[in-house]
């Protein structure tokens, strides 16, 4: 890669959450293997982010690569309208087998945000088919569900990612976020805000949507499983369907295959993405019950009105099948448990640091919440120079490493975080 390529990128390519007038530096990765990203200067970085939660088995995994190569010899893509193919059928079988018995209808899409859009549209059509024009959704503060319009509308409007669009988005209902954390005692007052809203608006609410147990970039909070149980009880009482957004947490990240298993509850609609293909290629899925699917199909329109061009892409489905095969045959639960134990041991002592207000660990997720805002450019440079890739935001330094990371390599990640806290110039 030449210097002119770098200059071209700087001038013409818009990266996520970046300015074209004053873009943050981008670091050129030329290859990746295992937990390592190789830079153009031939140096290596330990990936602490799994490419935004996705690469759970690391990079260049032979089983995933083999699945891609085998499929591409047959076909890389074919439209899914009026056509089906073995990789999609096999994947949907596996997803139905992995998830609770109730979820037996699968809609495939090409990104997590689209999976959320699909879930929301499903419930709007569901109520239309029942003769009710419900379009209001209830969710909780500090939530994040993606960057497309419907996904933004059910994300916390106080979230700085979406504030600029607030007046343009559909208005929904937001209950207070739970205060009871995952490992602390349950406080029954946590459910009161949600209960009050659902009691007052039950006849208008099309559905409830939330991230089970782990709230992602809305604040990286881990809330008590009892909150999820109480929500499901209330929703069942008022016959309001529940959407669980497991796009970030699905496929083992919290120590369970799906985060909702911590509460022993089942959603009416489940959204999956990110690590569904082991971080190899983009794919997402929205699963729902036969009842919801049949109700939509019996409505005035007679079908569900959605169909992405790359829906059910054979390459993506093939590698997703391989990813699930790995999860069924390897020791991912032990891997995640070992990561969790080490993160507790390495990160929890940082709670005594003057720049730290909280430390949170669950499964293969570690979060250090700082008392001061982070200087993104400075801290990113510090991390890269120290051989790790960590992408903080706001006041949060968090890691979600690949499950295959070794104890020695994970220790380096956490040591660099600890060292960063001692650099005052990295904070604002």
Curated annotation (Swiss-Prot):
Residue sites binding pyridoxal 5'-phosphate per the record: 112-113, 245, 308-309
**GO molecular-function term, one example from the UniProt record:** adenosylmethionine-8-amino-7-oxononanoate transaminase activity
What is the E.C. number? 2.6.1.62
Source superkingdom: Bacteria
> What does the UniProt keyword field contain?
Aminotransferase, Biotin biosynthesis, Cytoplasm, Pyridoxal phosphate, S-adenosyl-L-methionine, Transferase
The UniProt entry's GO biological process terms, in alphabetical order, are:
biotin biosynthetic process
* SUPFAM superfamilies per the UniProt record, alphabetical: PLP-dependent transferases (SSF53383)
Residues bound to substrate are 52, 144, 274, 307, 391
For this UniProt entry, what's an example GO CC term? cytoplasm
Site annotation (Participates in the substrate recognition with KAPA and in a stacking interaction with the adenine ring of SAM) points to 17
* InterPro entries in the cross-refs: Aminotrans_3 (IPR005814), Aminotrans_3_PPA_site (IPR049704), BioA (IPR005815), PyrdxlP-dep_Trfase (IPR015424), PyrdxlP-dep_Trfase_major (IPR015421), PyrdxlP-dep_Trfase_small (IPR015422)
Please list the residues that carry the modification N6-(pyridoxal phosphate)lysine.
274
Self-association or partners: how does it assemble?
Answer: Homodimer.
The record's listing under PANTHER family reads: ADENOSYLMETHIONINE-8-AMINO-7-OXONONANOATE AMINOTRANSFERASE
Family membership noted in the UniProt record = Belongs to the class-III pyridoxal-phosphate-dependent aminotransferase family. BioA subfamily.
Q: What does this protein do?
A: Catalyzes the transfer of the alpha-amino group from S-adenosyl-L-methionine (SAM) to 7-keto-8-aminopelargonic acid (KAPA) to form 7,8-diaminopelargonic acid (DAPA). It is the only aminotransferase known to utilize SAM as an amino donor.
The entry's protein name is Adenosylmethionine-8-amino-7-oxononanoate aminotransferase
Q: Which organism is it from?
A: Buchnera aphidicola subsp. Acyrthosiphon pisum (strain APS) (Acyrthosiphon pisum symbiotic bacterium)
Gene for this protein? bioA
